[in-house]
Regions:
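Extended hydrophobic secondary-structure segments that form protein cores and membrane-embedded regions
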Residues: 1, 61, 161-163
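Conserved AdoMet/S-adenosylmethionine-binding subsite of the radical SAM
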Residues: 3-152
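Auxiliary Fe-S-binding modules of radical SAM enzymes
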Residues: 113-203
Length: 203
């Protein structure tokens, strides 16, 4: 559904980032890419220097959807980026038949963290033409994300979001963990059990 800025030459990428440097109110620059996992050889010193040429805080969102995408070459490319001073976050799409089970998602998020990539967004599939076979229900997505809470640390948890059609932005859609009642809160844990807070006995 979009282009990839890292398919540009380092020269062209530097031209863009240097122009961003001149915009005073822009303090943070973020790029999104799949290049580190699909064409890791492109990630070299000139590209990394071009990414950082703005002199501003630079973040790179690495798009990956399955643990198998982390080839040795991809791992090396990611390490070059991090060691070169680029902060990495992740973006993944929840896809039926690809990563729609807790084990695969947990393994993917762990790999992100092991590669020094902070899990960021887990997208519900867009309504893009020709992709209906990848879509699953929001209810299933919510259940999968709830299942992650019992398997991986907080550092590895992504934010499950829906990008609303019509340009209305991204909205977190994980199932609500809390509900208010009688001045107390009923809080649901990762196993689906509900706990009263504060407890009735005050402990």
């Amino acid at each position: 559904t979009g282009g990839d800025p890292l398919v540009l030459s380092p020269r062209r990428l530097r031209e863009i980032t240097e122009r961003l440097a001149a915009i005073v109110h822009v303090q943070v620059v973020r790029f999104h890419t799949r290049v580190p996992v699909v064409e890791p050889g492109r990630v070299d010193a000139p590209m990394i220097a071009a990414l950082r040429a703005s002199g501003k805080a630079t973040y790179l969102a690495v798009h990956a959807n399955h643990p198998r995408e982390f080839s040795p070459e991809a791992s090396e490319a990611i390490a070059r980026l991090v060691d070169g001073g680029v902060v990495l976050v992740s973006q993944s799409v929840l896809l039926r038949g690809v990563n729609d089970d807790v084990e695969t998602l947990a393994a993917l998020m762990k790999l992100f963290v092991q590669h020094r990539i902070k899990p960021y967004y887990l997208h519900h599939p867009d309504l893009a033409p020709g992709t209906s076979h990848f879509r699953l229900s929001i209810e299933k997505g919510q259940a999968l994300v709830a299942g992650l809470r019992g398997r991986i640390s907080g550092l590895a948890q992504p934010t499950y979001v829906l990008d609303l059609p019509g340009g209305h932005g991204k909205v977190p859609i994980a199932a609500a963990a809390i509900a208010n009642g009688d001045g107390c809160w009923n809080i649901r844990d990762w196993q689906g059990q509900t706990h009263r807070y504060p407890p009735e006995d005050g402990t």
